[in-house]
Amino acid sequence: MSEEERNRGAEPEERAEALADTGDLPESEVAGDLGEAAQRGPAFDRDAGKVQKDTRRGRRKERVGLVVSDAADKTVTVSVETLKEHPMYKKRIRRSKKFLVHDERNEARVGDTVRIIETRPLSRRKRWRLASIISRAE
């Protein structure tokens, strides 16, 4: 019977300890206290024995586009153009995509150039919010 077969039915703490002994898990990922069941990451404070809440947030995507519709309440449709290079012919091709964007104060109008930022899902298709209006339509 191999060591892996013996560890298959073991408790999670024992499996983590066995994996650390075999070198499959980095030592930094295994908790020193078996009662903590292999706490991971920088959010675990070994001295206090508690898990600290990580309040940092990852970088959110930003896009710049043109408002093409403002008919809905607190929602605008923004068209974002990107240039992609064709893999074989190397010609730059214009691609556009429409995003539904949350506009809390209904301040964007058709023709405005706006900066939008990724956010939590607000509805089925709305996952962006208005960050700022770069230039107004004339």
Swiss-Prot record:
MF terms in GO: rRNA binding; structural constituent of ribosome
CDD domains listed in its UniProt record: Ribosomal_uS17
Region (Disordered) residue spans: 1-62
Compositional bias of kind Basic and acidic residues: 1-18, 43-55
InterPro entries (alphabetical): NA-bd_OB-fold, Ribosomal_uS17, Ribosomal_uS17_bact/chlr, Ribosomal_uS17_CS
GO biological process: one example: translation
UniProt keywords, alphabetically: Ribonucleoprotein, Ribosomal protein, RNA-binding, rRNA-binding
One Gene Ontology term, aspect cellular component: cytosolic small ribosomal subunit
PROSITE patterns linked: RIBOSOMAL_S17 (PS00056)
Keyword DNA-binding: no
Any Pfam family matching the protein: Ribosomal_S17
HAMAP family tied to this protein: Ribosomal_uS17_B
Function: One of the primary rRNA binding proteins, it binds specifically to the 5'-end of 16S ribosomal RNA.
Subunit architecture: Part of the 30S ribosomal subunit.
Family of this protein: Belongs to the universal ribosomal protein uS17 family.
Official protein name in the record: Small ribosomal subunit protein uS17
Native source organism of the sequence: Rubrobacter xylanophilus (strain DSM 9941 / JCM 11954 / NBRC 16129 / PRD-1)
